[in-house]
């Protein structure tokens, strides 16, 4: 049985105040084209369908277009809510959608029952587990000693108890200990929301969502597929892909990926203003990509953001890397302050801000201004 594993669509997301909706539709169309050439038996959507609990109307319309496109291809869809989603909103109409083989995890009310599929090797049980917090599980199982995310997940998965003689797939949205995170994910405080990878041992394949980098955790079949698009510059050097999973007889799982090409890549550029505005440096490149530019000029370039956007219209972020920004000079102790002249105070301030000393010309000019001010005060 073949599956396409997707997660973390984050429909409606904005990156540096740039809307990703057009890029998201583009990549979803590409995924549909992949499915037309690499047929599967079902699609797994492992949470964070939306970027916010109350998504914008345009994001809702985009998902409302994508799910029927999958259903029109006679593909069962198994979707769960993630930590960015509202479980209640994602589950709206779930009973009606199930009639079109679009199965959406309900609001958590206890261990999920398996949804069976069948192929030439027999049944495959699909378990849909939405994003869990300890408080959710304590509410359903008040007699269980649940202090951590691992306690909560373990409590639920013990009740799932997949049949070891049958193949089973779990769709979940949790932070598994040992996985690598990105800047675009919701911050984790001290790893408190981590869960133990061993909790998933009873499942043949675990389709995970939540982390944006494609990766396995421990075994190959405990896997994050990652986002279909880059959502932070910490992902600039990643190669996004769609994950295909094939279940053979019990114990045989084959994984493969297909590259996804975005409408606009998310890249980083570095150089001086003169270098980056030289036609030879950008001719033939995708200047409409989403960019983070780091200027190496020692002096700030006036109106640099607007001027660079003439060439790079989707410049998202502009920073400087120079002596001023690289290190910070130490502040003088108060005891030394009283012994310094006004020019020495200003020179120390200038060095603190720019990490380089006043030139002789600048010092002479400042001394002249100071003497003029002192004369005006004395008068």
Where are these regions (language model features)?
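N-terminal active-site segment of His-dependent metallophosphoesterases
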Residues: 1-68, 72, 362-372, 376
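Divalent metal-coordination and catalytic microenvironments
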Residues: 8, 28, 43, 48, ...
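Short amphipathic alpha-helical segments and helix-helix/interface helices
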Residues: 32, 64-68, 94, 157-158, ...
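His/Asp/Glu-rich metal-coordinating catalytic cores
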Residues: 55, 84-218
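A short helix->loop->beta-strand "cap" motif at the edges of active sites that frequently abuts
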Residues: 72-77, 166
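A conserved active-site cap/scaffold subdomain adjacent to cofactor or substrate pockets
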Residues: 197, 204-262
């Amino acid at each position: 049985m073949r599956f396409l594993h997707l997660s973390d669509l984050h429909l409606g997301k904005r990156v540096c105040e740039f809307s990703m909706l057009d890029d998201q539709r583009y990549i979803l169309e590409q995924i549909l084209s992949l499915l037309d050439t690499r047929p599967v038996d079902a699609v797994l959507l492992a949470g964070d369908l939306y970027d916010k609990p109350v998504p914008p109307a345009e994001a809702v319309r985009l998902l409302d277009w994508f799910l029927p496109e999958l259903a029109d291809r006679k593909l069962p869809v198994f979707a769960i809510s993630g930590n960015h989603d509202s479980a209640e909103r994602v589950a709206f109409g779930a009973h009606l959608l199930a009639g079109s083989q679009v199965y959406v995890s309900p609001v958590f009310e206890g261990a999920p029952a398996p949804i069976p599929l069948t192929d030439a090797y027999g049944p495959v049980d699909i378990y849909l587990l939405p994003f869990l917090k300890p408080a959710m599980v304590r509410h359903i199982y008040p007699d269980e000693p649940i202090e951590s995310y691992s306690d909560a997940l373990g409590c639920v998965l013990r009740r799932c108890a997949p049949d070891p003689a049958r193949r089973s797939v779990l769709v979940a949205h949790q932070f598994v200990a040992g996985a690598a995170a990105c800047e675009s994910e919701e911050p984790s405080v001290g790893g408190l929301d981590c869960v133990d990878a061993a909790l998933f041992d009873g499942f043949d394949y675990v389709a995970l969502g939540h982390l944006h980098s494609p990766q396995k955790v421990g075994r190959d079949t405990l896997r994050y597929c990652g986002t279909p698009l880059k959502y932070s510059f910490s992902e600039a050097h990643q190669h996004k892909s769609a994950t295909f999973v094939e279940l053979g007889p019990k114990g045989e799982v084959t994984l493969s990926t297909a590259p996804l090409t975005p409408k606009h890549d998310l890249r980083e550029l570095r150089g001086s203003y003169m270098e980056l505005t030289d036609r030879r440096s950008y001719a033939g490149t995708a200047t409409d990509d989403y960019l983070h530019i780091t200027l190496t000029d020692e002096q700030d370039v006036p109106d640099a953001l607007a001027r660079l956007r003439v060439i790079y219209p989707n410049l998202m972020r502009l920073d400087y890397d120079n002596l001023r920004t690289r290190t910070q000079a130490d502040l003088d102790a108060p005891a030394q302050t009283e012994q310094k002249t006004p020019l020495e105070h200003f020179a120390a301030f200038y060095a603190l801000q720019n990490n380089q000393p006043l030139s002789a010309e600048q010092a002479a000019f400042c001394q002249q201004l100071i003497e003029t001010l002192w004369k005006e005060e004395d008068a």
